[in-house]
Amino acid sequence: MAVRELKNFVNGQQVAASSGETSDVINPANAETYAKAAVSNASDVDSAYKAAQKAFEEWSQTTPSERQLALFRIADALEARAEEAADIESENTGKPRSTLVEYEIMPSIDQIRFFAGAAKNLEGRATA
């Protein structure tokens, strides 16, 4: 199996850590290295923070209906790739793949859809 390279996801782009440093990611079920992940430093965190701050400013201007639609699209995309998500999660956690779709992936999709419905109704209000 080829060892994958996992980069940081910043501002919609996959980017290596500025230091170029990586760390092995090991499947706990078989102790095999399946990926190398970027090891981020303060500069990388600052870049990610700035990108997230900008994205939040844009996201906060979306309507509840737009937010709902975005969450439904995320749920649909995850559902379409549920088997792939289960493979990745099994590799990452060592959990049996056979249980992941039914007991973790599909309930996660249900939660996203639940909160998509709530997004349209909350309209920025909060209760204590």
List each model region and its residues:
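Terminal low-complexity tails and localization/encapsulation signals of metabolic enzymes
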Residues: 1-36, 69, 73, 122-128
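Glycine-rich loop-to-alpha-helix module at the N-terminal edge of alpha/beta enzyme cores
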Residues: 32-122
